[in-house]
Amino acid sequence: MRLEFCDIIDRVSKWEEGFFVQATQNKELSNVRLLIYFIVSLMFNCLGNALTVALNLGSALWTAAAVNISDVTPVSLSMMLFIFGVLIIITNVILLNKIDLKRIIGNFIFMVPFSTLVGVFSPLLINVGITSLPLFLRIVLDCMGVVFISVAISIYQRINWMLHPADDLMQIVRFKFFKGNSSLAQLVVFMPPIIAIIVSYALTHQIYAINIGTVFALLFQGGLVGVFDKIVFPDLKHRNLE
């Protein structure tokens, strides 16, 4: 009887150990999956922004604002995107009413490859000749750039490991003030870049990266993010919301 009881205890212990190992492996698999999703979203975001900049038929508004302000100043596009990111991080801290170092570090980590890749991809796309395509195809590609950006935002907002500060701002506004309404949140977040573009135009009487794609982004980007939340990786839900 004692041997049978000890045997049962031993089997239960082994089962618990096996269950723990399996759970750990599942967690690791989940993290690998999230990492793949994150890399996919980063590439979508960089390619989408680079497309809109290269085609000059209208960028997403934050990128368009960076293009116009960099034209007014001697600052490169990559550096201007980085500066915008820092200013938005400060805004996010004010809205959250706290300094979340993990969140801020994540913002900076995201900005480095994003700013660099957009600055690199844009001239590469110009060099392959996409600006020589018929106007209709260029318009389609420009709108596709905005769609790619929306896909990217949807994915990495749900992962919520690290976000571009502008998309972190949109997520904060979306869930803090608008009960998850991505369309309203995006319109509010677009106000600062619109003001920056107006100021740039007043100084130079020139305007860049503003066109049909910008209008498309203004009208549809927020709504597209909400749509892609449901249809792109639908098993991926919003994580770690405050």
Locate predicted features.
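Core subunits and conserved enzymes of cellular information-processing
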Residues: L3-E242
